[in-house]
């Protein structure tokens, strides 16, 4: 394998790299015999890195001849201090990287605490040559993510950007134009559904080409194929970057280095807790009017169709029967049925129902059975009741579902400090789905100050194609995105949809990840309009075309002064590691992320880029992974940016406050401290799609700054000692990469 290439040295990946990437993909998906290129084992003591083999390899490589000047340079850097280096007033001549490190903040608001200093930790058990390869690979991987995030107006943290620019020898230019835009909350007395201020029609022409919506000034420009200069993603560049990352996560030295750094991060946090736990607690005790109960926390991953608990649903069914027994609520091909007649048809009476007979709760029977889990969305096993109570498009125009959601929202408002981001479904089966959903939203006036909304797109093209609902995959993409583009260009012609889009913060991609498509996304893959087969495209195929259209859409909406959207897919709950690799490239944040424990390289990259992960241990416990084996605590200790979420309260929770139930169980099982829980709660607010104004209110005016400078303990109840530890540890790991690259100059 050739050495990894830096971005400035050309990005063309040769045939050997592509061939290697295909071999890695095949070995994982087809379960080839022998040793897998991507380790299927947890990153723990059982990680198959042979100690004797590694020691022998290092001993052999160290004895090989190497450039003396480079060796002396590395030897001179064998001591790396954990603490923030000297201040800007130092008279010592510094390199551009050292100048940045030394100008880090001095934390006037952080109490003194005990730090750990590591000496001789320059290459984490890999040879000098391997260390260079590792640093180049990690550097380019971070550059890849930064590129895709900025192009699509998604989030990439400032700190790694500073290190990347200093490695390039450039100054970081603070540019807030790359930030996503969320709709601010309505002012007092202002109608959140107002349509008076909708922008005028731009008159642009739209055309889908190769699965991506292209925007033209007019029809004549469309005929000449002269689109407006928006950042249309380049498929060849994406595939080259994807192949590079596939090769990177399978490289032995990179896996060894990442595995050792992750073990170091875990051990280091445990030492930090042992030394500073009481000092952190002292900070929190001295913080007036703030504790875990009254710091803001957001349910960053919850599905609207299951946002209520089972008792709430049962109570609503009985209440609706008491009030509307003689109301016509359901229609069949033969006749229309009243609510009383519908229950008679199902041979049941609402007053005889219990939470057990409702049978919507996931149990032992759903473990590793996603098909059985989906059946739990049908109360009493009856699809008629699901259509009536949990759907937006039915005979009564989704009135019951809207009422249930309003009641859940009222509970959140009553709790005051809890927020949620429910997902509503767009399937892509027909182009009028958006109009129906937005009409339901606006007509029922579904607004709650403690809720923001997301759109989930189920990956079920194969189902629609087998029933001949769609001619090809491109039509599904067109049904999903074209109405949104049209409403953005001409809001006044689509008032309901334009208002609805103001309340949407992102797109999610959902389905059972354990279903393998066996297809590797490559330059030979059919274009979406050519994908006429009944097989489902791969996860990466779905993700790329969703990202590509969101990127163009965000550029258009940003130009119009409208809110933009994030790409926040379900990822890593099951299935191949290529899902997580794709998310690292193009997703703002993900839900689940369990499979990160199987890839030390991806896990380390998620740490370096601080990619938010919404974890749902109770959901995983019923479907894929026992609670005690959940990597939540391991990820938290290492410093990954994780939050807690409920996923489906109807299936997994029992109480009126499912998010608090999730925190309470995690705190008991994992023995979390108050500071731990408040840190997770703060992460959830940073991860979510609520507006800048609300985040500034909940977290402090400086929340966009990283480290203790951006933490207001009076609002977050997170100790400044913890924030300083997290920031210094993060900078330490980024600095190792910078030092490794500097030594190769």
UniProtKB/Swiss-Prot annotation:
The annotation note on the cofactor reads: Binds 1 zinc ion per subunit.
InterPro entries to which the protein is assigned, alphabetical = A/AMP_deam_AS, AMPD, Metal_Hydrolase
Q: Which UniProt keywords apply?
A: Hydrolase, Metal-binding, Nucleotide metabolism, Phosphoprotein, Zinc
Gene3D superfamilies, from UniProt?
A: 4.10.800.20, Metal-dependent hydrolases
Single GO BP term: IMP salvage
Which residues participate directly in catalysis? 592 (proton acceptor)
Q: Name one Pfam family in it.
A: AMP_deaminase
Indicate yes or no for the key word Phosphoprotein.
yes
Molecular function (GO) terms for this protein are: AMP deaminase activity; identical protein binding; metal ion binding
Q: Which residues carry this modification: Phosphotyrosine?
A: 214
**Which Cys-Cys disulphide bridges does the record give?**
none
According to its UniProt entry, what is the function of this protein?
AMP deaminase plays a critical role in energy metabolism.
What this protein is called in its record is AMP deaminase 1
> What organism does the UniProt record list as the source?
Mus musculus (Mouse)
Gene name of this polypeptide: Ampd1
